[in-house]
């Protein structure tokens, strides 16, 4: 397996040296840790992830939990993993797609971002982008309503309500928007 230069120096491995059973065990351990770290880097290279999300994914892919935790800690210490930055990026992207604050909180929690970090990130993005949740609900509904215009009004109402509810908008906002777009029946 592969061994980092740091490990080779720390274990005092050099050509012609006698390697004890203890050193062989340490080499195996270091090799596994490096493999787990490399896998974590690869997963992080495909897309940004939250710390807990990455740790769970590594374990699900068969990495030992202790090594997954160590790899995540190392990446965080190196500045490659930052839940606050991830949450802001996630919130900005999802806000543009029309997700509500509540739905973003749920999605971030599912990815392992703690509630305080998620709320702070969402608040910052909402303030920076000047988003009003009722207006966002209205915009998303209007866009969706265009695809429903040929359907009977009861079907429009049901589908639009379900669509907005899945995005996590407040029931009062959803009801008002649906009533305005579909008309009261």
Where are these regions (language model features)?
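An alpha-helical, amphipathic repeat domain used for nucleic-acid recognition
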Residues: 1-185
């Amino acid at each position: 397996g592969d061994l980092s230069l740091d490990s080779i120096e720390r274990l005092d491995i050099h050509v012609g040296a006698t390697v004890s059973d203890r050193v062989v065990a340490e080499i195996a351990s270091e090799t596994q840790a490096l493999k787990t770290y490399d896998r974590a880097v690869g997963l992080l290279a495909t897309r940004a992830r939250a710390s807990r999300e990455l740790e769970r994914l590594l374990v699900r892919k068969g990495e030992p939990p202790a090594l997954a935790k160590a790899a995540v800690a190392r990446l965080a210490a190196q500045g490659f993993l930052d839940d606050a930055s991830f949450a802001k990026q996630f919130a900005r992207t999802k806000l543009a797609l029309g997700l509500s604050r509540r739905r973003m909180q749920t999605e971030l929690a599912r990815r392992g971002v703690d509630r305080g970090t998620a709320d702070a990130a969402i608040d910052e993005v909402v303030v920076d982008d000047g988003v009003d949740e009722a207006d966002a609900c209205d915009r998303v509904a209007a866009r969706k309503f265009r695809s429903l215009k040929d359907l009977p009004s009861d079907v429009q109402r049901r589908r639009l309500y379900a669509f907005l509810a899945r995005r996590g908008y407040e029931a009062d906002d959803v009801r008002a928007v649906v009533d305005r777009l579909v008309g009261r029946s």
